[in-house]
From Swiss-Prot:
Its EC number is 5.2.1.8. GO terms for cellular component: cytoplasm. Residues 163-248 form the PPIase FKBP-type domain. Involved in protein export. Acts as a chaperone by maintaining the newly synthesized protein in an open conformation. Functions as a peptidyl-prolyl cis-trans isomerase. One of its GO terms (molecular function) is protein folding chaperone. Consists of 3 domains; the N-terminus binds the ribosome, the middle domain has PPIase activity, while the C-terminus has intrinsic chaperone activity on its own. It is found in: Cytoplasm. Keywords: Cell cycle, Cell division, Chaperone, Cytoplasm, Isomerase, Rotamase. This is Trigger factor. It catalyses: [protein]-peptidylproline (omega=180) = [protein]-peptidylproline (omega=0). Belongs to the FKBP-type PPIase family. Tig subfamily. PANTHER family: TRIGGER FACTOR CHAPERONE AND PEPTIDYL-PROLYL CIS/TRANS ISOMERASE (PTHR30560), TRIGGER FACTOR-LIKE PROTEIN TIG, CHLOROPLASTIC (PTHR30560:SF3). Pfam families: FKBP_C, Trigger_C, Trigger_N. It comes from Streptococcus thermophilus (strain ATCC BAA-491 / LMD-9).
Amino acid sequence: MSVSFENTATNRGVVTFTIGQDKIQPALDQAFNKVKKNLNVPGFRKGHIPRAVFNQKFGEEALYDDALNAILPAAYEAAIAELGLDVVAQPKIDVKSIGKGQDWTLTAEVVTKPEVKLGAYKDLEVSVEVSKEVTDEEVDAKLENERKNLAELIVKDGAAEYGDTVVIDFVGSVDGVEFDGGKGENHSLELGSGQFIPGFEDQLVGAKSGDEVEVKVTFPEDYQATDLAGKAAVFVTKVNEVKAKEVPALDDELAKDLDDEVDTLDELKAKYRKELEAAKEIAFDDAVEGAALDLAVENAEIVELPAEMVENEVHRAMNEFMGNLQRQGISPEMYFQITGTTQEDLRKQYEADSDKRVKTNLVIEAVAAAEGFDATDEEIQKEINDLAAEYNMEVSQVSELLSPEMLKHDIAMKKAVEVITSSAKVK
């Protein structure tokens, strides 16, 4: 096979390659055997037309598309491998010369991985705003949050306050006309929770049981029900009950209720402190990793980032996110409905930092190459086992989905990140 490469721009070029008759003829034979099965030609049984008759009647050219589709992927990959190119996007293939008895010549417009010139990536000095210290106030705050979760709602006399729950009947109308979904009975609403549209809950503060309040609001411009968006509405609201939260006493009994592994409040606080310390340790390490990677990228020189790489990263991130949702039993449609967003909103979210993610990955790959990182069979098997456990999959499923080369790449990347972060020094 003849192969050549012409550089047309930074990280772009054209690969010209030929496919020889040793590959073409078997592919034509295979294409003929596939096509003839469905051919009805007078004088021959279905599927038994001789090759010579087929060529005379239809022409060998009728087989070219099927034959080319069969051999093109391997021929293209062989050409790329021979040239040692690292292609990062789908090529644009063009047939230049194809005919009977001759080698076929094709071109492929390709986008190649940009060159990365590494700067300093070890012993980096970084600053992080995350502290590993756990204060008494943080322990008390966690305890108070857990205590509030055990609060009971008790009917109270007097005016409703923020944090109270009101049980209400309501009927909404726009220009005096009731609308679908604007009516409810015995609905429990915590004031200040933000469950209802802005301004609704505020107007019930101060109301008492038995009061009837005309709540006047305006639907947000981006309200999910487009027929109501931006419109003024009135909700005639009757307050049936006002309930206040009654939290349990802060004592050893509370500690036992919150955690059956402790007997006293002091033991519970000690346990919470350890949990907070562990969480802060992880947050601190993540912050150091992020800062070190950012600095390593800043120190590196990347020659023109191809737009295709950024676009591929957006697609990859979105697909990964959607896959994680579906593993939790949440369909894309359900997610967009719950969040009030669209696929375009999600795309914009991932586009925002896709450029940074691509550059970071390129630098990590360059570090892995510079350090000569590889993966042993034992490391690959451990990675498979870890992924199977993380995603609740069978080990065999993970092995089928991920090739050894993909796993080696991921392991080398992890080693490179470890080299960058483990040597980093926090200012």
